[in-house]
């Protein structure tokens, strides 16, 4: 999702704590990227350097109070792992969203010197790297979806000197391209190993293939003309939902195996940031619930309907990890050790993970009379 302390692949998990934890971090820098996008970097104290060690493609979750209500939002890290190893730089990309509660707060409020709660890195949008690999990677990205993809590209090109990377990046116009200069610098630095194609919907370009939107037909055209599907070892997709669906469908139709395709969906948190005010009485039909967190066990009652496993734990005062509450970010992932649950939504867990007992607790309701779930097995 390192060279330091890693036995095996360079992409092996680099994080310290099993369960993500919040720490107050001071903002080092706020840098404009486009008219509606900025990057924010944080100062990492020496004692937290290991805790915030990340894998390319991961994200952090920010937490603050807006109008008296706790609000969380996850943002992808946009620097390479080697950047962090060299100078401790932890930087995220934030794009202003119309009506977006947290993004507008970030634009209007976050300044150098301010402090905000930041969760340790999480996420699984990565592949394991190895200096001996000579792979061909491709990424389809759109808008702010470039944020984790940039970290993946930078890290891969530096740690796998025999691998190549092709990026197909869609935007409305030249002015809307995030990290435009940084991408050009990478293109110049790795002239024989990094290929960059910009696809613009509003600004006309000389080559017709580079005009329009990244729908399935456009993605398929790139695979036919410039990036042969049988040459792709691994593919990454991140951006607006229609673009991601289109790229995924095009890769599948071209014969790229599903296990070679990595997809990162940016989820919008559900409107309610707090815990639902569902009354749980002795008469409420509920299962027996046992939650394991940091080696400690807590027994609760989990109603069969109306409230999720995560919210029952939060209501009991447990510091359970979560971010989007929409079944997208995977921050609330845990493992069912006993019993059976059902999930309302699942946009991120793979089929094999579900078979192994992993669940998104923000989407979980009990099926059996007893459920034991562990956040220590993530």
Segment roles from a protein language model:
Residues 1-21, 26, 36, 253, ...:
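Iron-sulfur (Fe-S) cluster-binding modules
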Residues 104-290:
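FNR/FR-type flavoprotein reductase catalytic core
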Residues 83-88, 130-133, 160, 366-375:
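Ligand-binding loop in jelly-roll beta-barrel domains
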Residues 314-316, 331-378:
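Iron-sulfur (Fe-S) cluster-binding segments and ferredoxin-like electron-carrier domains
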Residues 284-325:
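C-terminal accessory/binding modules appended to enzymatic or scaffolding proteins
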Residues 9-115, 119, 171-173, 184, ...:
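Ferredoxin-reductase
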